[in-house]
Amino acid sequence: MSKNKLSKGQQRRVNANHQRRLKTSAEKADYDDNLFGEPAEGIVISRFGMHADVESADGEVHRCNIRRTIRSLVTGDRVVWRPGKAAAEGVNVKGIVEAVHERTSVLTRPDFYDGVKPIAANIDQIVIVSAILPELSLNIIDRYLVGCETLQVEPLIVLNKIDLLDDEGMDFVNEQMNIYRNIGYRVLMVSSHTQDGLKPLEEALTGRISIFAGQSGVGKSSLLNALLGLQNEILTNDVSNVSGLGQHTTTAARLYHFPHGGDVIDSPGVREFGLWHLEPEQITQGFVEFHDYLGHCKYRDCKHDADPGCAIREAVENGAIAETRFENYHRILESMAQVKTRKNFSDTDD
């Protein structure tokens, strides 16, 4: 390879810097302070590239530009913004976001090129939605629970589409959900189709800022349609007949207000919740039932697998820890290692 030829990684960085300079040049003349009114408090309802929809104290939503000094802005951020004044030609000027208040929490997901990417801010509850279709995946539930424990945000597990279960199926699903009930997690069984179980869900959402999370096709948008009412209807898509997987419908995270009180952030569906940016120790801490056994293994560097004298494995064998959870713990660690290997390979200069 020629010494003067740029690698793929170097080309990405050059292109990114070029685009950044173009944006900076384009913005310099755009934000004249005389075009804006007095500062006010607001909350980001949604983010679209270099613009954001900001809701003011009176409930009005304003499309705003974003000061280039603001490095990160996501749905749920509480901000200081200024409304745009009417221009001389009678054309309204967009408002502008001036500053972002300190966040109480931020939900992130790993990204190959951008590191850790924020999704939503100031949430105090993550609603983990699962369903028997496209499949009841305890592995995905466990991934979200690890994320909740790492963020120290309270989780709520919601199993949707229970109207599709017969008595035998309901018994099986309850047995699976008891794994989580037995370690202190709250589980609600609902149907967005028949609206069974929606009242307890409404109560759990009241007074909270929640985000609905889960793989595509589990009915997040259908649940939100039922909870929000037709006037706020969100697009939905059925499970694909070909793949059995859900088809993504929501394209940008957006905050909605429930009629019964409380807010929700609807975010794009994901088929797998990435945790590869975390350390293995954080994954271990994310399994709450492990806590009583940590520090009691025979060896300090115990991997909690086939190591002799592993207190966690002994707890699994004794029935104190669910075998399914223990298996998912190792699946998560294995998937993290695989993704990190791929990332390191892609970052290697050609």
Swiss-Prot record:
Gene3D superfamilies from the entry?
Nucleic acid-binding proteins (2.40.50.140), P-loop containing nucleotide triphosphate hydrolases (3.40.50.300), Probable gtpase engc, domain 3 (1.10.40.50)
Q: What class of enzyme is it?
A: hydrolase
Family annotation (SUPFAM superfamilies) = P-loop containing nucleoside triphosphate hydrolases (SSF52540)
User: What intrachain disulfides are recorded?
Assistant: none
Domain called CP-type G: residue spans? 104-273
Q: Which superkingdom, per the lineage?
A: Bacteria
One GO CC annotation, please?
A: cytoplasm
The EC number of this protein is 3.6.1.-
Q: Name one Pfam family in it.
A: RsgA_GTPase
Query: Could you tell me where the Polar residues compositional bias lies?
Result: 1-17
Keywords attached to this Swiss-Prot or TrEMBL record, sorted alphabetically, are: Cytoplasm, GTP-binding, Hydrolase, Metal-binding, Nucleotide-binding, Ribosome biogenesis, RNA-binding, rRNA-binding, Zinc
InterPro entries for this protein: G_CP_dom, NA-bd_OB-fold, P-loop_NTPase, Ribosome_biogen_GTPase_RsgA, RsgA_GTPase_dom
Q: How is the cofactor bound?
A: Binds 1 zinc ion per subunit.
Q: Which cofactor does it need?
A: Zn(2+)
Q: Which stretches of sequence are listed as region Disordered? A: 1-27
**GO MF terms, alphabetically ordered:** GTP binding; GTPase activity; metal ion binding; rRNA binding
Q: Where does the UniProt annotation locate this protein? A: Cytoplasm
The biological processes this protein is annotated with in GO are: ribosomal small subunit biogenesis
Concerning its family, UniProt says: Belongs to the TRAFAC class YlqF/YawG GTPase family. RsgA subfamily.
**HAMAP family, sorted:** GTPase_RsgA
Q: What does this protein do?
A: One of several proteins that assist in the late maturation steps of the functional core of the 30S ribosomal subunit. Helps release RbfA from mature subunits. May play a role in the assembly of ribosomal proteins into the subunit. Circularly permuted GTPase that catalyzes slow GTP hydrolysis, GTPase activity is stimulated by the 30S ribosomal subunit.
Could you give the subunit structure recorded for this chain?
Monomer. Associates with 30S ribosomal subunit, binds 16S rRNA.
Q: What is this protein called?
A: Small ribosomal subunit biogenesis GTPase RsgA
Q: Which organism is it from?
A: Salmonella typhi
Protein encoded by which gene: rsgA
